[in-house]
Amino acid sequence: MRDASNQRSSRRLTLFTRLTMASEKIRNPATDHLLTPENSMFIVIDYQPVQVASIRSMPRDELVFNIVSATKAALNYKLPIVHSTVNVKTGLNRPAINELQELLGHLPTYDRTTVNAWEDTEFKEAVKGFGRKKLIMTALWTEVCLAFPALDAIQEGFEVYAVVDAVGGTSVAAHETALRRMEQAGVKLISRVQLYCELQRDWARKDTVPGFMNVFENHDGFNAEKAFQESNQH
């Protein structure tokens, strides 16, 4: 009797496991309201040494870590990427920080004189050329080079997602005020971790899982997943 009861319990557990691990089919990216690798693109604006040095809304090492991590997410999920700098060709500014050049050096960089990237024709044509309506935007400063193109893109019918912990301003007040203004205009605020998880969404999508593991990294060096694995070895 006990063996029969154990067998029934085992069958129920197996059935429960199968039921709880049945993933839905991947949604149609054309109609999915969430970010997917097929319906979104990634924009990086003005992560140059002077701009990074002027950030006062968060620790600069954390900012650099977060923009590098967000960029790695875009590369992992093969998003179209548009990278822009300001005033490099005029000699008034330096190229993007080395950490981003290492990741994006194989892509075109659209250098501008306009403060608002959306008012640069080459930049705007590059963005529109990919034909995607969901724009994941990162830029320095939040209150200028992120806010201006984000507000313009919203006016032209795009959906804009600002990665709030991968951008920064000249003060906490400037950063937060710009985020409020953008949100009031319809910009959607997301975080670095949310970006990774929204693009991945299912551990069964194994091709991107190795890159997805970067979601557990932190700027202070702590990795929760690695710490958990190490604790299980003792």
Language-model regions: role of each:
Residues 93-100, 123-124, 149-151:
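Distinct, well-ordered alpha-helical segments
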